[in-house]
Structures are given as C-alpha cells and as structure tokens.
Amino acid sequence: VRRPILKSPAFLAALSVLVLGAVALQVSLARMQVVLRKLPIYAKDDLPLRTIASSVPGWERVGQDNILSKEVIEELGTENYLSRVYRGEFNGKPVIIELHLAYYTGMIDTVPHVPERCFVGGGMVQDGATQTVPIPLDLERLSIDPYVDQAEYGSVYSAVGENFQSVRMPFELDSRLKLRVTPFLDVRSDRRVFAGYFFLANGGIASSANDVRVLSFDPQTTYAYYTKVQFTSWDVESSEELGVIAGSLLDELLPQIMRRVPDWIEVMEGRYPPDNPNQPTPSNG
C-alpha cells in the first residue's frame, strides 16, 4: 500500500526543518531589529506639497499649477505632488524653471520616475551625458541644530521656516546636496532642455534612483518615505547652470519642502509619529 506523501516521514521531516528555519529567521531578524515591512508616514499636520508658497523672494509662479489627470496620477503613483513653474532672474536675465515634487511612503514598490526614462518615453532624445553637479546653497541662512547629536547623525542644519518655526534640514546637507542633470532635445521644436533631480529619503539625500531605495529601505527603520525634487528649464546653457539656479530657488523653498516631509530626527528618536513603536519609555522618576 502506497503511503500518502503528506504522512511520509521524509516529508514531515523536511516540513519541520522549513518551519523551524522560518521561526529562527524571524527571531534573528527581531534580535537584529531588522524591519522588512515599512509603514507609511506623513509630515506633521499632513501638509501636502501643493501648499508650498507660490511666491517667494526672487521667484514667482507663472500661471497655475499643473493639475495631473487621474490616469497620469495613477502612473505617477502618488496624489501628493506639485508641478509648478517659477520665474526668476539669473545673471541679469529672466529665467523660467519648472519644479516638480512627488512624495512616496510605506512599502515603496514604484520605480522612481526620472527624466532619463520619462522624457525619452515622451518623445525627447538625450542630448549629452548625465552629470551630477553641485547645488550651491547659502548656508549662512542656516544654523547647526544644537539639539541633534552630530556624532550620530552627521551635520544637521536647521532653518527658520513659515511662521518663524524651526525646520530641520536633511542630514549632511553641506556635502551631499547634488543634482543629477541630463540634457534633452525636443525634436519637434529643436530646442534643448535640461532636467535634473535629487531625492529626500528618510532624512537623507540621494541623487540617483538606486541610492534612494537604499536610504528608504534601511533595514533598521520602521517607516519609509522619499520625495523626488526635480527641476527643468529651457533657459539654461549647461548642467552646472541648472544646479546654480536650483540652489537659488531652494534657498527659499527647501525649508518649506522639509516642513512637508517627516522630521527624521523625531522619527528616529521615537517622538514622531505618536504611535511610533520606538518611542522612548517614560521614566518612573
């Protein structure tokens, strides 16, 4: 008589090994504080990106914000976005620059939408090498945050934001803020356009899609988010020039952007959000 396979000693032994292995893996991950499932997290007061000021010193909005269709939003993968055109001045000449922001959180399974893919898919052709260029900021407008352990988190600046509130900047802002820029040619109009971007992710800065996934999926963090910050302009002559102009606009807008993402120091210290599982244990004293 043929023994049913589910009752055979060999099968039961193999099943036992698999079950014990799975349990051992979970125990090991717990001991190492490895978190595989990331929870969504949002800015304090759930401020959306579209509430960023339309006019700041040296820059003003042109027209109305670009409201994406339902189909495009579905492709983008988030409803928390901003697509806006600003007009300013560079070297005594007017300059137009488009700012695009998009916020993602939780189990981030979307591939970041970046110009190298989206612009080419939209009919443009790449017209030169991709470069990573500096974004010069006026750091004198910022101050080192005295409440942050710089030995643990690196240099962390704070800025005076809206309503004179203090806003923390990304980790190591002075050394890591760079723009990944690619030139494109619109074959229909025969015009050249430069597009560049970086990411804010889990309190840090990344300049590539690969780097942002590493930051967002830190195995020892409970939460995950990233925000794409993208600049596009037809009025610049080089990648470096786009970086300089982006810096001029970010001098005014970066504190507002950071107010619309989680304060990662508060998250890491367990003080935010209110249901953070890592919140500090109240003292009995």
What residues fall within each predicted segment?
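N-terminal secretory-pathway/extracellular module detecting exported/lumenal segments
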Residues: V17, V34-R37, P57, G63
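Primarily extracytoplasmic/secreted proteins
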Residues: A22-A24, V34-L36, T221
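Short, highly charged C-terminal tails/helix-capping segments
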Residues: D263-G285
